[in-house]
Amino acid sequence: MNIFAAFEERIGEALASLTRAGQLPEGLDLGRVVVEPPRDPSHGDLATNAALVLAKEARTNPKALAERLAAELRSDPRVTEASVAGPGFLNLRLAPQVYGDVVRAALRAGEAFGRGAKQPGLVNVEYVSANPTGPMHVGHGRGAVFGDALANLLVAAGREVVREYYINDAGAQVDVLARSAFLRYREALGEEIGTIPEGLYPGDYLKPVGAMLAKTHGRSLLGKPEAEWLPLVREAAIGAMMERIREDLAALGIRHDVFFSERTLQEGGKEGGEGGAVARLIEALRARDLVYVGRLPPPKGQLPEDWEDRDQTLFRSTAFGDDIDRPLLKSDGSYTYFASDIAYHASKVERGATELIDVLGADHGGYVKRMQAAVRAVSDGRASLDVKLCQLVRLLRGGEPVKMSKRAGEFVTLREVIDEVGRDPVRFMMLYRKNDATLDFDLAKVVEQSKDNPVFYVQYAHARTASVFRQAREAFPGEDLSAEALAGADLSLLTDSGEAEIMRLIAQYPRVVESAGSAHEPHRLAFYLYELASAFHSFWNKGKDLPQLRFVNQTDRMSTLSRLALVAALRGVLASGLGILGVTAPDEMR
């Protein structure tokens, strides 16, 4: 039961009634009409912008239109007050039984409460896609958690989702990985390697790869030229790094449906030549006159060292909203990263995706326009791309920066953080700030048992709901406390302002799932859960001072059952929301 969607429909009916009465023209576009909680709860339960967005089209004054709508809605038995505020906002106050109906609906729907109806189209969410050249760091962890929670959120909102990881296994960086692993192979055979040469990957994480190569090949690789050992070592090193990455992701509860290898885009053909997926893609674009040979103007400001004033093979990305056309081939004839990226996103479209979401690091800001243009081109406008950039994570301990990891060589690994504080704090706190804002992750604060630690505060609320039911079973042995039985309780007894606040927030849950999913912003759900937990803890504390407001009262069975119905509905929402974020909902805090 989504009261916001229900009242959007009701406002549509009211507008239709005014149209039939000749007070409004026909064919008004209701696409921008929104029903949402008012910014100030004292103004009512619902607010709508209907009059503001429709007044011009209706050729009337926003305030006058709002007054007409208010008059129509006052006859609705669910509405106790309809008032106009400001330039034409319409605020509605609802009858208490509306919230009682929401609690009953939540109890009867169980896990389905707040979930959206199935929607058409396939969403491809690509996240993590860390280069297989070393351990994952906490920045990778933020993108991993964001992407996984977003995928969960979209599923909850009714979307079909494919979760994808792009393995960057075709670039120069994997050759550097192979040379770094070969150095560790020589070390494993007893050679003194000294300081790691500049340009190779430092850190101890490649030592096991070197040991594995030594065990498998003995000394047989030492006398071979690089051209012979490099492909073999590269394959082994990529495999070992991807195995480690998968283990780290599993420790964080992250899963993917597809691991897509960049190398497969070039299989069957030579770089810059015929046969591979990238080459076929370029030829298909050329056939549509979207590829040409030309010269790019020099970039503004200081010229990059690698900029060349020469004829280049260019993609007409400006035809699809980009700032400049983009090169597809390097001066040596090999593909640019952009060319491979176009082919990769074309593959997503070919596999049925109509909505593409890429979760990337903040350093990919320049990537957005060109890839959105590319997706429009390869899909003929049938697919869209949203790029979500995750800002940096500053790792702190008690407010002080954390030193680098010796094992990784230059950063603290994600696994080190998970092992220290646990999966739940990592996941929740990575989502408790909008993705495009820098995140301070304090290893000391995320394990504190206080209101200032959001993950503890929300999980503690769920644990408290479980303790309420343990008390209730002791106080009322034999009483049917199932959700179905509690849905029959007299919810008109829930008259305290604290109870009303909890019911108001429960009613918002379906809208939060829907809006957070459509905006691709899982932090909205994390914020909502903290607000809901706060309302519950506040009412719990109120009962300490006022015994008549306690959840379980042995001398008042009726009010106890009413409050248990409220607690059961709240517990279901907390568990559902935490589940979407990938965080456990404990019955006891340990």
Curated annotation (Swiss-Prot):
The keyword Cytoplasm applies. Gene3D superfamilies: Arginyl tRNA synthetase N-terminal domain, HUPs, Isoleucyl-tRNA Synthetase, Domain 1. Keywords: Aminoacyl-tRNA synthetase, ATP-binding, Cytoplasm, Ligase, Nucleotide-binding, Protein biosynthesis. One of its GO terms (molecular function) is ATP binding. Its main location: cytoplasm. GO terms for cellular component: cytoplasm. One of its GO terms (biological process) is arginyl-tRNA aminoacylation. A motif ('HIGH' region) lies at residues 130-140. It is an enzyme of class 6 (ligase). It is found in: Cytoplasm. PROSITE patterns: AA_TRNA_LIGASE_I. It catalyses: tRNA(Arg) + L-arginine + ATP = L-arginyl-tRNA(Arg) + AMP + diphosphate. Its EC number is 6.1.1.19. InterPro entries: aa-tRNA-synth_I_CS, Arg-tRNA-ligase, Arg-tRNA-synth_N, Arg-tRNA-synth_N_sf, ArgRS_core, DALR_anticod-bd, Rossmann-like_a/b/a_fold, tRNAsynth_Ia_anticodon-bd. Belongs to the class-I aminoacyl-tRNA synthetase family. HAMAP family: Arg_tRNA_synth (MF_00123). Monomer. This is Arginine--tRNA ligase. It comes from Methylobacterium nodulans (strain LMG 21967 / CNCM I-2342 / ORS 2060).
